Amino acid sequence: NPTLYGELAKGQSPKFLVFACSDSRVCPSHILDFQPGEAFVVRNIANMVPPYDTIKHSGAGAAIEYAVLHLKVENIVVIGHSCCGGIKGLMSIPDDGTPASDFIEQWVKLGLPAKSKVKANCNNLEFADLCTKCEKEAVNVSLGNLLTYPFVRDALVNKKLSLKGAHYDFVNGAFDLWNLDFGISPSLLQ
């Protein structure tokens, strides 16, 4: 479409920042039916959003900052998915702390609060079901981590931004979308 790409050559103004997994089976533009220019997309193992830190994980922080402050996206969506290898890896990390990899394990440990919550509340489930619960809970952890970014909190308080969690079950063809009520108020910005 020459007209579309002619417009895109002039710049971008996406309404969405999407965090999605690097998994080749789950393309966020396909899942959400986005056309070029409609979403600023960050993909990584297990669709993790790290907490605010100007040194560690600065690539993710730079993408969030650019999307919120410069592109002025109106929505941030974190999408988890079924059969996520990153979450399976997180759930498989030995409790004794024995490292199994150099990079992957350190990255997925961002989701340890999700693993802890799932194991505490659902430990009677089979491993695959625990992983499914953790896929969704890790999205919630990432949504919480987004609140550690001052410019995200500011945009939320000023009603210029919304946060949504999602889970795509590609095996059963289901897509769940949710909001979390964080109780953000102007007093939290001080």
From Swiss-Prot:
Keyword Nucleotide-binding recorded: no
GO molecular function, one term: carbonate dehydratase activity
Quaternary structure note: Homohexamer.
Origin superkingdom: Eukaryota
Compartment(s): Cytoplasm
Documented EC number(s): 4.2.1.1
Keyword Lyase appears in the UniProt entry: yes
Catalytic activity reported: hydrogencarbonate + H(+) = CO2 + H2O
Function, in words: Reversible hydration of carbon dioxide.
Pfam families named among the record's database cross-references: Pro_CA
Gene Ontology biological process terms, A to Z: carbon utilization
Protein name, as recorded: Carbonic anhydrase 2
Keyword list, A-Z: Cytoplasm, Lyase, Zinc
Family statement drawn from the similarity comment of this UniProt entry: Belongs to the beta-class carbonic anhydrase family.
Lineage, opening ranks: Eukaryota, Viridiplantae, Streptophyta, Embryophyta, Tracheophyta
GO cellular component: cytoplasm
Domain statement: Possesses a transit-like peptide, but it is proposed that this peptide is not removed and that therefore the enzyme stays in the cytoplasm instead of going to the chloroplast.
